[in-house]
């Protein structure tokens, strides 16, 4: 569906050329919700704007539905862009037009007849839950409703791809959840491919199938959301998921744990469980089988796309040989085990 091939983007700066993207390669299958996350300035918005060539890359190719957009002449590019909708952090609604009028605008500009416009707009308003608000003006509806108008407007041309650039970052948590639920429902009902840009890992957790982590214009990690959450490899990924899965020990415990690590009287472990392992007595069975002491420092259980996962930080005490055997056993049970030689 979407192939991002060797994309680099450079801009002129006061001190010379600035590279916003460096050799980015991503493949996004049809019907997937794909998240791109990173800190401010990582290049997220620049990358998503290359997908519909709002920003033309300095190098590389963008292939959507088998067509290389970077090689298309202007008329064919305009046609191809009709298959790519986009929503933004700022709603960009026309204050002089009603909800209905804002959604109808791109169809009017395309020269569609009035009865055809109505036949397209009314189902979209029903889809996004705004049928009752169709005659209201932007000033008369909430921020979440404005974003729903933006989504309906982006879907008016019946695109195959929807790009979302920080579309929920200006919304409160409850409204954010409702918008993400709507995007997921649209993805399933319309088989719409969605590329979602955000700086919030909780957004990725709620709605995305896979995720790419961007840092300084480079993809530093990519994979299924559940895998990235349970076993983050890059330090940027660890920092981004810190508010979703507790990665750090509470400050009050750090000194005590550090002292035990110095004396060799304990092993600091991070354990991650998923699927059926979340509600199985794996830890208690390990303690009994290998005669270990496990001090649970912190833990939590959450859910990603209907799949339960859990994370524990434990300080294990016991004979080194038995600790090693216990870690092997845990891994055999499907537990992700990370041995830490220091206190973060």
From Swiss-Prot:
Summarizing the function annotation, the protein's role is: Part of the ABC transporter complex MetNIQ involved in methionine import. Responsible for energy coupling to the transport system.
Q: What is its main location?
A: membrane
Q: Where is this gene product found? A: Cell inner membrane
What this protein is called in its record is: Methionine import ATP-binding protein MetN 1
Kindly list the GO CC terms recorded for this protein. Answer: plasma membrane
* Domain ABC transporter, residue spans: 2-241
Q: Which residues bind ATP?
A: 38-45
Entry keyword set = Amino-acid transport, ATP-binding, Cell inner membrane, Cell membrane, Membrane, Nucleotide-binding, Translocase, Transport
Gene that produces this protein? metN1
Keyword Chloroplast assigned to the entry: answer is: no
Q: Does the keyword Transit peptide apply?
A: no
A GO molecular function assigned to this protein is: ATP binding
Q: Which InterPro entries match?
A: AAA+_ATPase (IPR003593), ABC_transporter-like_ATP-bd (IPR003439), ABC_transporter-like_CS (IPR017871), ACT-like_dom_sf (IPR045865), MetN_ABC (IPR041701), MetN_ABC_transporter-like (IPR050086), NIL_domain (IPR018449), P-loop_NTPase (IPR027417)
Q: How does it assemble?
A: The complex is composed of two ATP-binding proteins (MetN), two transmembrane proteins (MetI) and a solute-binding protein (MetQ).
Please report a single Pfam family linked to this protein.
ABC_tran
Against SMART domains, the record matches this protein to:
AAA, NIL
Q: How does it sit in the membrane?
A: Peripheral membrane protein
Q: Which Gene3D superfamilies match?
A: 3.30.70.260, P-loop containing nucleotide triphosphate hydrolases (3.40.50.300)
Any idea of its EC number?
7.4.2.11
Which family is this protein grouped under? Belongs to the ABC transporter superfamily. Methionine importer (TC 3.A.1.24) family.
* EC class (word): translocase
Q: Which reaction does it catalyse?
A: L-methionine(out) + ATP + H2O = L-methionine(in) + ADP + phosphate + H(+); D-methionine(out) + ATP + H2O = D-methionine(in) + ADP + phosphate + H(+)
């Amino acid at each position: 569906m979407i192939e991002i091939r060797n994309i680099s983007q450079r801009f002129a700066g006061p001190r010379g050329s600035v590279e916003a993207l460096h050799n980015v390669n991503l493949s996004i299958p049809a019907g997937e919700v794909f998240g791109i996350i990173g800190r401010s300035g990582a290049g997220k918005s620049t990358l998503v704007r290359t997908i519909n060539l709002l920003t033309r890359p300095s190098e590389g190719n963008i292939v959507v539905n088998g067509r290389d957009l970077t090689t298309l002449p202007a008329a064919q590019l305009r046609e191809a862009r009709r298959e790519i909708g986009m929503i933004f952090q700022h709603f960009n609604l026309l204050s002089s037009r009603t909800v209905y009028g804002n959604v109808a605008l791109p169809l009017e500009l395309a020269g569609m007849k009035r009865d055809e416009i109505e036949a397209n707009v009314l189902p979209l308003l029903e889809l996004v839950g705004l049928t009752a608000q169709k005659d209201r003006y932007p000033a008369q509806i909430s921020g979440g409703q404005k974003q729903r108008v933006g989504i309906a407007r982006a879907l008016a041309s019946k695109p195959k791809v929807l790009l979302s650039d920080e579309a929920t970052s200006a919304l409160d948590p409850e409204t954010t959840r409702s918008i993400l639920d709507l995007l997921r429902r649209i993805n399933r009902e319309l088989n719409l491919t969605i590329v979602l840009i955000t700086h919030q890992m909780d957004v990725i957790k709620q709605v995305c199938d896979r995720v790419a982590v961007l840092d300084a214009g480079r993809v530093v990690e990519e994979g299924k959301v559940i895998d990235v959450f349970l076993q983050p490899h890059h330090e940027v990924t660890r920092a981004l998921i810190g508010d979703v899965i507790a990665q750090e020990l509470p400050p009050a415990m750090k000194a005590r744990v550090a002292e035990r690590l110095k004396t060799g009287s304990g092993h600091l472990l991070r354990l991650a469980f998923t699927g059926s392992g979340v509600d199985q007595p794996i830890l208690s069975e390990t303690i009994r089988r290998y005669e270990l002491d496990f001090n649970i420092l912190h833990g939590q259980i959450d859910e990603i796309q209907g799949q339960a996962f859990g994370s524990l930080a434990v300080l294990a005490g016991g004979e080194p040989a038995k600790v090693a055997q216990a870690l092997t056993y845990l891994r055999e049970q499907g537990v992700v085990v990370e041995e830490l030689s220091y206190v973060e």
